[in-house]
């Protein structure tokens, strides 16, 4: 979620077994691969994640978000399911999510959409 903390960066992980069956040298590349600036940014982010013990913090606070979203799903017929992991959550909605997202913003809540029927809730990893 916050791999670069604002610096554009992407990554993926796979087991060696999957890599051996999926990739050969040269199969995966990028224009900016090996960029030292991005590498330094990611390294600094990881250092801060360790210093602040972000993973433990997310494990502590995520159940609260999950519980509150589950309560909303139970309360409103237009919300049909919650899905996600940790602090990356989505709620399926039977209403046009663009309109719901716009009204949420009018009420002071930033909610983004994912596809045509999901409201995404992605708070900062340092949320209390």
Whereabouts are the PLM-identified features?
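Conserved N-terminal phosphate-binding loop of PLP-dependent enzymes in the Aspartate aminotransferase
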Residues: 1-128
């Amino acid at each position: 979620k916050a791999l670069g903390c604002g610096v554009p960066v992407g990554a993926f992980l796979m087991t060696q077994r999957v890599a051996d069956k999926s990739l050969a040298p040269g199969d995966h590349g990028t224009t900016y691969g090996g960029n030292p600036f991005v590498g330094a940014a990611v390294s600094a982010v990881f250092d801060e994640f360790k210093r602040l013990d972000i993973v433990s913090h997310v494990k502590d606070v995520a159940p609260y978000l999950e519980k509150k979203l589950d309560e909303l799903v139970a309360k409103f017929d237009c919300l049909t399911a919650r899905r996600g992991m940790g602090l990356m959550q989505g709620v399926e909605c039977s209403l046009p999510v663009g309109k719901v997202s716009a009204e949420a913003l009018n009420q002071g809540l930033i909610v983004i959409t994912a596809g045509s029927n999901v409201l995404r809730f992605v708070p900062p990893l340092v949320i209390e």
